[in-house]
From Swiss-Prot:
Keywords: Lyase, Membrane, Metal-binding, Mitochondrion, Mitochondrion inner membrane, Transit peptide, Ubiquinone biosynthesis, Zinc. It catalyses: a 4-hydroxy-3-methoxy-5-(all-trans-polyprenyl)benzoate + H(+) = a 2-methoxy-6-(all-trans-polyprenyl)phenol + CO2. This is Ubiquinone biosynthesis protein COQ4 homolog, mitochondrial. Its cofactor is Zn(2+). Pathway: Cofactor biosynthesis; ubiquinone biosynthesis. One of its GO terms (cellular component) is extrinsic component of mitochondrial inner membrane. Belongs to the COQ4 family. Its main location: mitochondrion. It is a peripheral membrane protein. GO terms for biological process: ubiquinone biosynthetic process. PANTHER family: UBIQUINONE BIOSYNTHESIS PROTEIN, UBIQUINONE BIOSYNTHESIS PROTEIN COQ4 HOMOLOG, MITOCHONDRIAL.
């Protein structure tokens, strides 16, 4: 049974779900007239995979088990986030709509990838700028903004964009927190995200990721990293409404102070 779960393939799972629904659901559609949808929403509605409540529960359970067995299965983690995060995404939507910056993001729906961001220009910014810090983070950790999986299982395209935005901003959060991508820091960043945005998958990754830490890492985690994440969460502003792309030239320490982020010591 465990070996079978380890071999779960998300593309194969997606095909199974799609084929089982074609006879009952037909092609994907929406009650909103196409002319009232923006480009992201139209594209998403053409590519999403519609699933029933039962299939959502099944996918959530299967992806959670597969994620626990193999934390490197990013496809399963992504699936888990989509099948369990709707209520949290609705709360994030409310938070974003409550701020001018957040509303602008929801209207413009910016994307973060190498087609939309000139990393060379960020590297040319002053060394104390947020844009430079982000470009340096990508280079130092051998990370690309093109690695995020597309959202597929959410019904509402507005929530699909918020989940997309969350995924594409993950490395920006690493950069502003000054946290590399090793396991200890990944768990810490997940705690910060979980306490900040409430997504169940973030809590799951934080809790079960910590279980996989080595003894020495776990001691450091309990003594320094986890208390730092919790303390920051008490004073940190919501991160999802931040239009990071408009902050490239801002001094990174000023941005941290604005957001209520206390540097890790």
């Amino acid at each position: 049974m465990m070996q079978q779960l380890r071999r779960i393939s998300l593309p194969r799972l997606q095909r199974h779900v799609t084929l089982s629904l074609l006879s009952r659901c037909g092609s994907t559609s929406t009650d909103v007239p196409p002319e009232e949808l923006d480009a992201f929403e139209r594209d998403y509605l053409q590519q999403r995979i519609q699933i029933t409540t039962f299939q959502r529960l099944l996918l959530g359970a299967g992806s959670s088990i597969a994620s626990l067995l193999n934390p490197h299965r990013h496809d399963m983690i992504a699936c888990l986030g989509e099948t369990t995060g709707e209520n949290a995404l609705l709360n994030i939507l409310d938070t974003m709509q409550a701020s001018e910056e957040g509303r602008r993001i929801l209207v413009e729906k910016p994307r973060i990838n190498t087609k939309t961001i000139d990393l060379k220009s960020l590297e040319a910014l002053p060394s104390d700028s947020f844009g430079f810090a982000y470009a340096k983070f990508l280079k130092d950790n051998n990370v690309t903004p093109d690695s995020r999986m597309e959202v597929r299982f959410l019904e509402d395209p507005k929530l699909a964009y918020i989940m997309t935005r969350y995924r594409e901003c993950h490395d920006l959060v690493h950069a502003v927190l000054d946290m590399p991508t090793n396991m200890l820091c990944e768990v810490t960043v997940k705690w910060v995200e979980a306490l900040n945005n409430g997504l169940p998958m973030c809590y799951g990754a934080a809790v079960f990721g910590a279980v996989r830490l080595r003894p020495r890492q776990r001691r450091e985690y309990l003594k320094r990293y986890l208390p730092w994440a919790i303390e920051n969460s008490k004073q940190m502003k919501p991160l999802m409404p931040i239009y990071w792309e408009k902050r490239w030239e801002q001094k990174v320490n000023d941005l941290r102070a604005e957001l209520g982020i206390k540097p890790f010591q």
